[in-house]
């Protein structure tokens, strides 16, 4: 009788008729060296017929236990993160650094804030308002010590687009809606922080973020060209209407604003790049916006060129308390509020975590999100529009060696002094100077280096970058975000439902088994297929896994090259060490697969499941179904045992050899491999 002609059922029945016999008779002729097998300890499920139900109260047991352990100091640190650095502040070491960093960022923020307010379709003073109260509040409630918050270009463009279809920029309603938007954004950020939902943003690919940001930067830059050209262009978040209006108004082109704007832009770019290239001159990077403002204001005040439009009168004094109005438009603004909240998570939390890692302290992204929310809520009570973390100002703050949130308080003081004493001077600032500051700031957001990197490394991510940036350019920022997020989620779902599965082979001279496609020298054995599943197994991917296993069973010649010739697969070994989780649907599907294998005389073996996976399998009854003797600690143990059966098919007394080795799972079962009872195998210490 050949090995292939013996079914599992026949072998099991032979075991029941074979009797106990002496152990020495179990050693097949010609077998001289025992196989060493490490016994796999199976979990005790005698008192756990089914997984224990989890009481509703236990779901929050971790939180309640943590709350009970919290002391008064812990509560203060949680509610007011600033106390973490206040208690340990080293005045002699930190104050000078924080002072210089705060002044540097403040000097940079004043012109930027006015520029971004113009981008949002608001009077410049509202940029300063958005840089005042939110900065102070964030210094108290924010957990990052280097993040610089305030108006940013991308959020300003989103505000302009959201409000453009509701109210004209000259209307008071436009301002009221921008302030209401800050309140809505703050509420959403607080809710997400309290519910610890910051992890949702992980589903958005970095290539999507880069493509969206790059396209938005191009749109922002083009929208500011009107101040260089001297005539109005279409307000749009799409590139085509902007370009068409630029071409259509070419006959209105004026040289003075173009020359002044271009000159200031060149100066800004040179100072920025020199400051980044040389550490001893990094102050130039922060001073660049102020330099552009001073230069433009001086030219405008001295020469009074009539074709260059100026900012005009700016109210003097600090913002007054007022509650946001126009709540009847709140429902219309909710989608934009959600979008700005997403940008805040991407931009602010991403920067804050990177800076925290660089400065070696822990940062909770949910606490950070809550701090941003409080800053926007309180800011909206003092005429601020949505504020978030800035790439450029945070980088300058960190490069200036800011140590704590005190630098943010000093930045707020600089803004307050500007509101109290400097606003009369701002009326002579040319519009083209503010536009140059915006263009200079967003030019660094066009991430063409990332596109080149993605093309070289990962074509799929490059396609994501290209799709997102193209859709954003031609169909608008909102559509671009939705499409980018949709593609990100589609890729996540595809990867989850189609996990990587590898056929393993043995590396020559070792007991190590690796992917045969990655290691061509690895060899496998005829009649045995070893499959590694590199993901959790659950309802969404179990069907794909079963289909792949069936493919490997059919394509036996493709994956085998050593051992005795057999006409089909007799053993399938599942290497489950990478499997971190398995759900009930997957377990039921594996049980069905085992029964399917059984009808075709194929034995299933499982290697190295982790504790949780092993426990789930045991509770489902699969261990008893397959047999405890077919669960192994190592792939090599499973292969050696399977090889014994394959090799014994050519030895004398085949029936007895097969019978004793294919002992039924219900007979002589123990917590260790049943074959360990035979002298053929020994336990490896």
Swiss-Prot record:
TM region positions: 97-117, 122-142, 147-167, 175-195, 203-223, 255-275, 283-303, 332-352, 369-389, 406-426, 434-454, 473-493
Keyword Metal-binding: no
Induction (record text): By sulfate starvation in leaves.
Residues forming coiled coils: none
Tissue distribution: Expressed both in roots and leaves.
STAS domain segment(s): 518-642
Purpose of the protein: H(+)/sulfate cotransporter that may play a role in the regulation of sulfate assimilation.
Protein name: Sulfate transporter 4.1, chloroplastic
Organism of origin: Arabidopsis thaliana
């Amino acid at each position: 009788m050949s090995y292939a002609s013996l079914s599992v059922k026949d072998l099991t029945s032979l075991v029941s008729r074979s009797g106990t016999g002496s152990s020495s008779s179990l050693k097949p002729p010609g077998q001289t060296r025992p196989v060493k097998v490490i016994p796999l300890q199976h979990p005790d499920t005698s008192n756990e017929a089914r997984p224990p139900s989890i009481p509703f109260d236990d779901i929050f047991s971790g939180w309640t236990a943590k709350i009970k352990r919290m002391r008064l100091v812990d509560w203060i640190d949680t509610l007011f993160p600033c106390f973490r650095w206040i208690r340990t502040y080293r005045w002699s070491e930190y104050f000078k650094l924080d002072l210089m960093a705060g002044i540097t960022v403040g000097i940079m923020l004043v012109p930027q804030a006015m520029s971004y307010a113009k981008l949002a379709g608001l009077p410049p003073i509202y940029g300063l308002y958005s840089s005042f109260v939110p900065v102070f509040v964030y210094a108290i409630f924010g957990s990052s010590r280097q993040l610089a918050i305030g108006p940013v270009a991308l959020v300003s463009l989103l505000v302009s687009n959201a409000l453009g279809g509701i109210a004209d920029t000259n209307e008071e309603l436009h301002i009221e809606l921008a302030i209401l938007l800050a309140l809505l954004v703050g509420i959403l950020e607080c809710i997400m922080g309290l519910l610890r939902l910051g992890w949702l943003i992980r589903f958005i690919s970095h290539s999507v973020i880069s493509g969206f940001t790059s396209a938005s930067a191009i749109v922002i830059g083009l929208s500011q060209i009107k101040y260089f050209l001297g005539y109005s262009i279409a307000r749009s978040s799409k590139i085509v209407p902007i370009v068409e209006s630029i071409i259509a108004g070419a006959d209105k082109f004026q040289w003075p604003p173009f020359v002044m704007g271009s000159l200031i832009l060149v100066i800004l770019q040179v100072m920025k790049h020199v400051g980044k290239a040389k550490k001893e001159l990094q102050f130039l990077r922060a001073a660049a916006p102020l330099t552009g403002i001073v230069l433009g204001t001086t030219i405008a005040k001295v020469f009074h060129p009539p074709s260059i439009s100026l900012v005009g009168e700016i109210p003097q004094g600090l913002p007054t308390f007022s509650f946001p109005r126009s709540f009847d438009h709140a429902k219309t603004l909710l989608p934009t509020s959600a979008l700005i909240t997403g940008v805040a998570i991407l931009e602010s939390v991403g920067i804050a975590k990177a800076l925290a890692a660089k400065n070696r302290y822990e940062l909770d992204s949910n606490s950070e999100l809550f701090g941003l929310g409080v800053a926007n809520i309180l800011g909206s009570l003092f005429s601020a529009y949505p504020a978030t973390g800035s790439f450029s100002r945070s980088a300058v703050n960190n490069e200036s060696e800011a140590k704590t949130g005190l630098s943010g308080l000093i930045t707020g003081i600089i803004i307050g002094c500007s509101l109290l004493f400097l606003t009369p001077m701002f009326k002579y600032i040319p519009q083209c100077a503010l536009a140059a500051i915006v263009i200079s700031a967003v030019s660094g957001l066009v991430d063409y280096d990332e596109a080149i990197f993605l093309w070289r490394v990962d074509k799929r991510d490059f396609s994501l970058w290209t799709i997102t940036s193209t859709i954003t350019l031609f169909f608008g920022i909102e559509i671009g975000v939705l499409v980018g997020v949709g593609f990100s989620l589609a890729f996540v779902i595809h990867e989850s439902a189609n996990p990587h599965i590898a056929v393993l082979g043995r590396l020559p001279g070792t007991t190590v088994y690796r992917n045969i496609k990655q290691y061509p020298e690895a060899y496998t054995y005829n009649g045995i297929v070893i499959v590694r599943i590199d993901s959790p197994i659950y309802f969404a991917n179990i069907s794909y896994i079963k289909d792949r296993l069936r493919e490997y069973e059919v394509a036996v010649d493709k994956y085998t090259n050593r051992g005795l010739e057999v006409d089909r697969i007799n053993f399938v070994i599942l290497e489950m060490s990478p499997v971190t989780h398995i759900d009930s649907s997957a377990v039921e599907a594996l049980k069905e697969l085992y029964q399917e294998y059984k009808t075709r005389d194929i034995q299933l073996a499982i290697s190295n499941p982790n504790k949780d996976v092993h426990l789930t399998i045991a509770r489902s009854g699969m261990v008893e179904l397959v047999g405890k003797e077919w669960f192994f600690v190592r792939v090599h143990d499973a292969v050696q045992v399977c090889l014994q059966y394959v090799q014994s098919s050519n030895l004398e007394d085949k029936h007895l050899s097969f019978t004793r080795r294919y002992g039924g799972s219900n007979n002589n079962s123990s917590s260790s491999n049943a074959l360990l009872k035979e002298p053929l195998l020994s336990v490896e210490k």
